Amino acid sequence: MDDIPEGFAPHVRKSPVTDPWEPLYARKAEDRLVLGTRVREVHCNSRSMPHGGFLAALADNAMGLSLGVSLAAARQQVGGLVTVSLTLDYLGSAKLGQWLEFDTDFIKLGRSICFTEATVRADGVAVARARATFKLLEAKAAA
C-alpha cells in the first residue's frame, strides 16, 4: 500500500489543515502541481470512502498551488491567494487503498481574480470535478 507512482515525491509544503492527512505527495508538471495520496482510514467516512470534505480540501490545495506555479511562470507578483468560491461535483467514489490524484487541468489568470478546474481521480478513474475562483492579494511593497 506504500507504492507511490513514478514522478511523485513527498509534498514539502506543510499546513495544519493537511497535517492529519499525511503523507501527501506532489508531482511537478509543466504548468501545475499534481497532489497525490493513498486513501487511508483517516481520510474516510463511516462507509470506508474518502470524505467529500477531504476531497474538496485537497482539490482546493491542488488548484491554489497550481495557480501559484502559473503566476510565477507569468512573473505576476502576488501577496497570496484566497479561495472565494469552491464547487465540487462528485462523480463516483474511491475506496480504501486506492491512489488519489488531484490534477488541475484549467487555469485562467486575471489581474485580481483567477479561475481553475481540477479532476480528482482514484486509480485513474474520475471521482470528482472541482472548480474554484481565487482572489489575488496584492504583493506588499518592499520596505
Regions inferred by a protein language model and the residue ranges of each:
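Terminal targeting signals and extreme-terminal segments of soluble enzymes
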Residues: 1-143
